[in-house]
């Protein structure tokens, strides 16, 4: 059955962009960007991808076979723990039933006091969990509550996380790492409650290992729990209405966290990667010295059991006031009360350790509470307990804390949430080294090669108090998979973005803005800074118009994937800019060479002629006379005479040459161009040229075919010399984009990526041999496509035989 070769599918899958009707990308499903491009980058994957079984299917199978689930993708061994070095002690992986009697998934509802940090620097993750427990709808989405150690128990559990635009279901078994029968990592304040430990394991699986969770920003986990978008404030530079912002965030159900810089340059909860050995050493020491501590609560007749306490391994620094530097806290409430006749604004925070609290004004036992009546204490949920939660005045909060992170919920977080009015557009992209990883504006030669996204702001805000015609929107740029790739040496890139207004004459077009535009136009808005966080976001207010967003890493040549989200209060459109895929075609007065299928030559000599073959006899005669006149003029030239003599000497009487002979001819001619530094053409290059220029299937090319090839090479040679400004004999892969355009070809980013992968060396340079081979292939494949595309609609249909004939002999 013939398959349509059409560009529409791949580009819509990749970025929601409007595709070129002349693209030659085949239809495809899955695999990232789809189409031929995804077929190339995933060609080593199994031909048939078996659909993974769902939680329900696996759970049912375990019950039917009366077995406990064992996760093959996250096994109970060292590979799931640490990747940088081995742990000198042996952990035992145990199921909850082996750790304590009467284990429970959740006891009395999941709440923020259930979470106690273990021997891992993931306080950022636990602070986010504590925030999550404040929103029961979100909590039930992340932690499906229909799971139990009693009814239909099969040793299998699942949790759901937002992952770069999609919600994914992470399935795990319930084997947990222990030492001396104690959980090593996160645990509940109640010994027989395990939802927090299992949630941490699922999150570790999502990122490849427990070690991958060491160090991070709370908003990273908040986003993975909600699909929300972050706002980040340096408290010393916070707006005057910061209390109002925090109060409004709590009312909207947003998640919020805060932290204190340690003045050592560390992020909270994170040690330098080189210190993982020290982390493990301290962890071992703490585990070996850990003592069980028991509460005085009477547990008779309940499912609760005594909790143990292990002080977490820490790079954090405790202050005399009880707060901890380099540490993340959950913001669980923001309230206002009356104190001695005056309004007092308070902030409630929680330490993920489940202990170690603020001991200043408004702490659990402070004298300020003596002036608050009992009813107000109940409203504020004040209690005296070493549970890690405490109140602090807004003034002291602003004095001691340095960062505030807010994760705002988006319309797709909960379908029933009617308070949200944002419209959201999501675009996925990638920076490719040597092609579309151009770095920031400091690198003008490559900045313009970064992916570009058009933003159309169509409607102004509904704000009767604001007379300006303004559109409010938020841009969020997130880099993908960097935490999961830590074991391969990956770190977070320093990222940011800039926004430019598109000239009115270019509104509605799909053209990739070129280098000169950015040299002579200033940005209308940009991220305040480039920062090495997973996501950077910024609010903007601009007049209705058409803009282009340029996401980038700070330095060029840094390869990675990203997701760009645009949130607007009113209707807007956002899509990736993709050039229309096309090539300049020769004048219709020139008769094109027919394309002949190899298998048809011996039979019917079937031809697929170009549109130019249709013409009147008088027109043909005129063209022939013009060709003969032009040929005579060329033959008079010294180069032509020399050219024919060389060709005749090598080709012999049949005046046709094979790949070895073509190589000799080209190299003999190229040698005479002293200003072109090249070692000549490789045999494989001439083999490819023969295949692409051979129109009669003889495996050789005649003088006319060679003449056509040489004319092309001469024009391409001029382009090469123009961009080889330093006469090194190479051009860099970024310059190749302009060279391709100068040669009459217009391609999209996916095709530029492929050219870079196929023809550039490890230094992202393209030599003359590879340069010419690339252009010969582009020229031949465009001519072939146009020959098949008789109705000019940008779609051709080929059966398998035709497709293989066209692609294998090329």
UniProtKB/Swiss-Prot annotation:
Q: In which tissues is it expressed?
A: Skeletal muscle. Low levels in spleen, intestine and bone.
Q: Enumerate the UniProt keywords alphabetically.
A: Calcium, Cytoplasm, Hydrolase, Metal-binding, Nucleus, Protease, Repeat, Thiol protease
Catalysed reaction equations from the record: Broad endopeptidase activity
Region annotated Domain IV sits at 639-809
Q: Name one GO cellular component term.
A: nucleus
Which residues does the record give as Ca(2+) 2 binding sites? 694, 696, 698, 700, 705
An example GO biological process term is: negative regulation of DNA-templated transcription
Residues of the Calpain catalytic domain: 68-410
Q: Where does Ca(2+) 4 bind?
A: 789, 791, 793, 795
Q: How is its activity regulated?
A: Activated by micromolar concentrations of calcium and inhibited by calpastatin.
**Low complexity composition bias: residue spans:** 9-27
**Sections of the chain in a coiled coil:** none
Q: Where in the cell is it found?
A: Cytoplasm; Nucleus, Nucleolus
Q: Per the record, which residues fall in region Linker?
A: 580-638
GO MF annotations in UniProt = calcium ion binding; calcium-dependent cysteine-type endopeptidase activity; catalytic activity; ligase regulator activity; molecular adaptor activity; peptidase activity; sodium ion binding; structural constituent of muscle
Q: Which residues form the active site?
A: 123, 327, 351
Q: What is its main location?
A: cytoplasm
Basic and acidic residues: compositionally biased ranges: 613-639
- Residues annotated as domain EF-hand: 638-672, 681-714, 711-746, 776-810
Query: For binding Ca(2+) 1, which residues are annotated in this chain's numbering?
Result: 651, 654, 656, 661
The positions annotated for binding Ca(2+) 3 are: 724, 726, 728, 730, 735
This chain belongs to the protein called: Calpain-3
Species in which this protein is naturally found: Gallus gallus (Chicken)
